[in-house]
């Protein structure tokens, strides 16, 4: 049994190569079936995301080049094109790499939590295709517990490092409960969709989506039970909003100082948080001059993000220490399994010798042989049979001039205690 991890990621390979070597839904099943039948593979999991493609395998000795050849052939990529971007980790290094990946320590965004879900899904897919053996199963189960420990003992995932998440985090800090807040989302693009997802996951149920075309916003609104309005209707709805988060491609501001001033009067000066993550601005800078209007720009969020990235780097030091400790512990456990197999084989061999000689001795006794003679013969033959292999090993080590090996055998046999 030997653990092997091979792959490419955003640090080693271009987008073009990552696309060529990706395992999409149509390729994953056939690939796992091929690995399941591969002569050099006992068990495998394929992790394939937009930023990485990796194989984690329990393999027989000498499987490294065979797996690299398989990966290249499966995707019809030349080995020469693949090798400069490929990394290979074996045994404890493979264990540590998987744990680092699952904890977000090897991600493009340090500490991002999504990768753990992707690794769990990859493991589930492999189990569904009967591609997982006991060693791979135990490795991934251990990895998931390590990832949980890292999340529990460190705050590596607790600081916002995306604009969308930072906007929601800011809103949470200012308002005690998002479940009681009405949020006006201006725009319906990818960033606003991410904002809506973060808001919903934090209990926000009252959202209004404003967009230039209502049709484009309808799909987003249906996901979160939001109202849909046009940009022209914003002045009529602004007073209802406790929080405004805006991200459009408009060349000119959409929300002006006068519009916000009117809304604040209608709200009897209950404060409004405005988070403008558009470039160029969606909200006039002068809005920040108003009492009870708290305006944050994308630059303000970026300073929060930069600070949080530095904090994640600090937390990553402790996370790396946990991964190093846990990967070493798991490797020790794996090695002990190899000893268990050897001990079982050794006991089986000794029992077979005992049963063979005991059977012959019982036959002799049944035939009327002298009991004392039978017992002496049994003890002599049993001794000779049991010490035969160790004797040969001692002789071989001495003849080949291997004093270190000779010392190990003597210690194993307990000869130094005599």
Curated annotation (Swiss-Prot):
Belongs to the glutamyl-tRNA reductase family. Possesses an unusual extended V-shaped dimeric structure with each monomer consisting of three distinct domains arranged along a curved 'spinal' alpha-helix. The N-terminal catalytic domain specifically recognizes the glutamate moiety of the substrate. The second domain is the NADPH-binding domain, and the third C-terminal domain is responsible for dimerization. One of its GO terms (molecular function) is NADP binding. Pathway: Porphyrin-containing compound metabolism; protoporphyrin-IX biosynthesis; 5-aminolevulinate from L-glutamyl-tRNA(Glu): step 1/2. It comes from the Bacteria. CDD domains: NAD_bind_Glutamyl_tRNA_reduct. Catalyzes the NADPH-dependent reduction of glutamyl-tRNA(Glu) to glutamate 1-semialdehyde (GSA). NADP(+) binds at residues 187-192. HAMAP family: Glu_tRNA_reductase. Substrate binds at residues 49-52, 107, 112-114, 118. Keywords: NADP, Oxidoreductase, Porphyrin biosynthesis. It catalyses: (S)-4-amino-5-oxopentanoate + tRNA(Glu) + NADP(+) = L-glutamyl-tRNA(Glu) + NADPH + H(+). Homodimer. PANTHER family: GLUTAMYL-TRNA REDUCTASE. This is Glutamyl-tRNA reductase. The keyword Cytoplasm does not apply. It is an enzyme of class 1 (oxidoreductase). Signal peptide: none annotated. The gene is hemA.
């Amino acid at each position: 049994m030997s653990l092997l991890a091979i792959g490419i990621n955003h640090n080693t390979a271009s987008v073009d190569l990552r696309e060529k070597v990706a395992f999409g839904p149509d390729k994953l099943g056939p690939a796992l079936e091929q690995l399941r039948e591969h002569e050099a593979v006992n068990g495998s999991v394929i992790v394939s995301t937009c930023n990485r493609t990796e194989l984690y395998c329990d393999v027989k000795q000498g499987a490294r080049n065979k797996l690299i050849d398989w990966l290249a052939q499966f995707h019809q990529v030349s080995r020469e094109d693949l090798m400069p971007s490929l990394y290979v980790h074996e045994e404890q290094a493979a264990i540590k790499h998987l744990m680092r990946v699952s904890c977000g320590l090897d991600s493009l965004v340090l500490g991002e939590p999504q990768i753990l879900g992707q690794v769990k899904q990859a493991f589930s897919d492999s189990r569904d295709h009967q591609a997982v053996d006991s060693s791979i199963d135990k490795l991934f189960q251990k990895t998931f517990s390590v990832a949980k420990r890292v999340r529990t003992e460190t705050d590596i995932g607790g600081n916002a490092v995306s604009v969308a998440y930072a906007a929601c985090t800011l809103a949470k800090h200012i308002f005690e409960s998002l479940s009681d807040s009405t949020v006006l989302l201006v725009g319906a693009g990818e960033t606003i969709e991410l904002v809506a997802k973060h808001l919903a996951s934090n209990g926000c149920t009252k959202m209004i989506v404003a967009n230039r075309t209502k049709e484009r916003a309808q799909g987003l609104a249906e996901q979160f039970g939001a109202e849909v309005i046009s940009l022209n209707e914003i002045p009529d709805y602004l007073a209802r909003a406790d929080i405004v988060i805006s991200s459009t491609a408009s060349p000119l501001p959409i929300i002006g100082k006068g519009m916000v001033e009117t809304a604040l009067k209608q709200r009897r000066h209950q404060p409004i948080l405005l988070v403008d993550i558009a470039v160029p601005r969606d909200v006039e800078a002068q809005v920040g001059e108003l009492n009870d209007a708290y305006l944050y720009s994308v630059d303000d969020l970026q300073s929060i993000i930069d600070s949080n990235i530095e904090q994640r780097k600090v937390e990553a030091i402790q996370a790396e220490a946990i991964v190093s400790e846990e990967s070493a512990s798991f490797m020790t456990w794996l090695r002990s399994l190899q000893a268990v197999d050897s001990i079982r084989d050794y006991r089986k061999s000794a029992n077979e010798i005992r049963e063979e000689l005991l059977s012959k001795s019982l036959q002799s006794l049944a035939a009327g042989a002298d009991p004392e003679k039978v017992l002496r013969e049994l003890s002599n033959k049993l001794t000779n049979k049991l010490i035969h292999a160790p004797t040969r090993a001692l002789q071989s080590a001495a003849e080949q001039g291997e004093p270190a090996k000779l010392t190990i055998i003597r210690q194993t046999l307990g000869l130094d205690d005599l």
